[in-house]
Amino acid sequence: MRARAIRREPVRDRAQHFELGERGEALAIDQLERLGYHIVAANFSLPIGRNTRDAIVNAEIDVVAYDGPTLCFVEVKTRATAEFALPQTNVDLRKRRQIARAARGYRRMMGLAASPFRYDVVTVVAKPNDAHPRIELLKGFWTDEQLRKRNWQEQYWD
């Protein structure tokens, strides 16, 4: 059974960036499968807390897959052009923390807390009618250690 990005019915006057994002996710899944990843889930969403207005905050993991024995949480970033900024620049600290919290919840729900895991990013640069998009896999883009708060009680200035 192969997981696929959610395909929605065409909606009149739908923004192009939604279509580009969905196309990018589908291309990323195809690329990951070609590289030997076993896709487990696509567009996995989980509530991770509440904001200052007490509204529920959800985090989404674009792709959950296995690369051999390693569970991979993959964020897909799609752009029509990389002239202004690379797609991976939008995976900022806030986004990394959201994905890490959702990944922690996923691992807990599935009983995989002790399993090896990593965070990958797939970048897709594809114009709307481009037959040959540029797809790049960035393995181990960040770690949980990079998200931890620093312990300033140790002797910093010595």
At which residue positions do the language-model features occur?
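Hydrophobic/aromatic beta-strand patches that form the interior of the parallel beta-sheet core
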Residues: V40, V74, D120-V122
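Catalytic cores of nucleic-acid endonucleases
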Residues: E19, T78-P128
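Conserved catalytic cores of phosphodiester-cleaving nucleases, focusing on short active-site segments
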Residues: A59-A82, I99
